[in-house]
Amino acid sequence: MKKLLLALLILLTPGLAFAAFDHSHAQWDTLAKKHVAWLPGGHASQADYKGFQADHQALKAYLEGVSAVSQADYDGWTKSQKLAFLINAYNAFTVELILTAYPDLKSIKDLGSLLKSPWKKKFFVLLGKERSLDDIEQGMIRAPGSFDDPRIHMAVNCASIGCPALRDEAYVADKLDAQLENGVVRFLSDHSRNRFNPQSGRLEISKIFDWYAKDFAARAASLETWLSAYADRLADDPRHQQVIREKKAKLDYLDYDWTLNDKR
């Protein structure tokens, strides 16, 4: 039945089955530029979900194109094209999930239940299979040997204030590395979520680094080693930066703010 529904979706969308996929992600790029805004300082962003709601048909059109991509087509893409596709799909489908209940929610967690988190809801088709947001992040992006880049944790957006910013543009293959690095720099420069505490001498960082510590350690000797490369972002005082570079600061994890990252 699911395969039949996918086939019908493709057949009923003119040109979708045979058109080459647009790796500029122009439809999503237009929506993001229109409905995502950086907050003062440029470290965090807000989404205008009311605006996304008004442009819901445009969002659906983009997601229909994403859902129409076959596994065979995907397999023929470059690594950067694949990762940009998955990040954009995750972020756009997250907005779509929020719109299923907007404005009657305060957090994406309101869309879950005691038995199932919102990230495990299978509500869309991707590469020919019914998927959840967790399927994209945990099963595809974080799959060992697929991309192995911890910077993705500053790219996929969970529609929450505690989450690294939703970008006001689409991720694209030819500038993906720069976009991922920029996301890390912006997030670690936000001292409301990542900072050195001079009173305690400890590094207070987002809970993301606790949840996914092994991803960061896999690219360095340890999480502390990975963080040390960004000492100048985590602290303003050169003395505190040196403590971070020498990996002498103990780590504390800050509470995560699951409040919706809404403009309202």
Give the location of each predicted region.
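Sec-dependent N-terminal signal peptides
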Residues: 4-13
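Single-residue recognition of alpha-helix boundary sites
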Residues: 13-14, 102
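Sec/Tat signal peptide C-region and signal peptidase I cleavage site
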Residues: 15-19
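Interaction/scaffold regions that mediate signaling and macromolecular assembly across diverse proteins
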Residues: 20-87, 91-264
